Every structure is written in structure tokens, then in C-alpha cells.
Regions:
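Glycine- and acidic-residue-biased ligand/ion/polar-headgroup-sensing regions
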Residues: 115-131
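Short basic helix-loop element that most often maps to the first helix and adjoining turn
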Residues: 11-28
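Short acidic-glycine-tyrosine-enriched beta hairpin
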Residues: 132-149
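Recognition helix of helix-turn-helix/homeodomain-like DNA-binding domains
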Residues: 32-48
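Histidine-centered metal-chelating micro-motifs
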Residues: 106-108, 144, 149-153
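DNA major-groove recognition helix of helix-turn-helix/homeodomain DNA-binding modules
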Residues: 51-66
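A short glycine-rich, His/Asp/Glu-containing loop-to-beta-strand
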Residues: 76-111, 166-167
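Ligand-binding loop in jelly-roll beta-barrel domains
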Residues: 148-173
């Protein structure tokens, strides 16, 4: 990722962390990162993997798209590229991504926020995908919907695969309360 993308991503993570009243140490610990690594990411100096960004989204209890919304170019590593196409703002929240996987790629994904599902439609190539214990082969034009709050994966054979991924997050209560610690006082925020 280039410097402007890393800076934007870092600011998004830091803003969400502070809004949720989490310390740098607490978020780093919860996400399984070294505090120094999270600090570098927030400052735009780190180079987080897609899995690291997903873990941070899960720990912040926000959709992945909230962290990468301002990133216009594809994010990628190890033969996988992902680009946010659009974000919904309704309840339940729906985000749409374009994803490309290189030949002979296995992309293992950690569980997302509880209640999340993914619906993937294969555009080109061949793909084996779904929950780890219920993988499905997809033909071009076919869609597979599965629980994404459990370990799941995407696996290609000797060809590239391109797909659309629709992530639907669990419906949220209408009036949720979050607390942000400011000068040892709690401020009630309605979302």
C-alpha cells in the first residue's frame, strides 16, 4: 500500500478506536498485535495485512468497509486483491466488494463480526469457497451464501478467479449506547 492509503487507513482506525474509548494498548492486545505495530499503523507508517485489518475491524466491532472506505485502490497481498465498491447505510448494513484471486491461492479468512454472512458470485475462473467445513465449487455466474462469522476460505486452482462479494452484517438495535471516556467522564452516544 502506498503512503496516502496507509495514512487514510491509519486515521480511520485511530478515529474509531478513540470513538469507542479504547486505548492503543487495549486494541492492540485484543487484536493480537504489538502496541508498537498498531501505533505505526495508526500513524500511516505500518503495512498491515488484510487479515490484520479484518482483526481490527472485528475488535472495533465495525464493518471492514468502515476502515477502508477512503481507500480507492485495491488492497492486496499473497495473490488476493480486494476493493470496496459500495457501502450501504441501512440496517442491516451491506457492503459490496470486488475480489480477485491469483492461481493456486488459498485465502483463509478469520471470523467476522457475529451474524455476518457473505454471498459471493463468481465472475470468471474457478473457485472453491465457503465455511471451512462446507466448501463449495462455484461455476461462473453462480452464487454461494455462507456464514462469515466462522472461519472460511477462498481457494483457486490453476486459473485466476474474479468475484463479487456481498457482506451483510447482523441487524443492529435501533438505539445503541456507546461510551467514550473523556477526562474520566462518560459521554452517552446514540448511534
Amino acid at each position: 500500500m502506498n503512503k496516502p492509503i496507509l495514512g487514510s487507513l491509519g486515521r480511520n482506525i485511530q478515529n474509531l478506536r478513540m470513538t469507542k474509548g479504547l486505548s492503543l494498548s487495549q486494541l492492540a492486545q485484543d487484536a493480537g498485535l504489538a502496541k508498537s505495530n498498531l501505533s505505526r499503523i495508526e500513524q500511516g507508517d505500518g503495512n498491515p495485512t488484510l487479515e490484520t485489518i479484518w482483526r481490527l475491524a472485528v475488535q472495533l466491532n465495525v464493518p471492514f468497509g468502515d476502515l477502508v472506505a477512503s481507500v480507492e485502490s485495491p488492497l492486496g497481498e499473497n495473490g488476493v486483491q480486494v476493493r470496496l465498491i459500495d457501502q450501504g447505510d441501512d440496517n442491516p448494513r451491506v457492503d459490496v466488494y470486488w475480489m480477485s484471486c491469483a492461481p493456486n491461492t488459498i485465502k483463509q479468512s478469520e471470523p467476522h463480526i457475529a451474524g455476518t454472512t457473505e454471498a459471493i458470485t463468481l465472475i470468471s475462473g474457478k473457485l472453491l469457497a465457503g465455511e471451512n467445513d462446507d466448501l463449495r465449487y462455484l461455476d461462473i455466474g453462480k452464487t454461494h451464501t455462507f456464514a462469515a462469522d466462522v472461519p472460511h476460505r477462498y481457494q483457486t486452482d490453476d486459473s485466476w478467479a474474479t468475484l463479487m462479494m456481498v457482506i451483510t452484517y447482523a441487524k443492529q438495535e435501533c438505539a445503541k449506547q456507546a461510551y467514550v471516556k473523556q477526562d474520566d467522564t462518560k459521554q452517552d452516544l446514540l448511534s
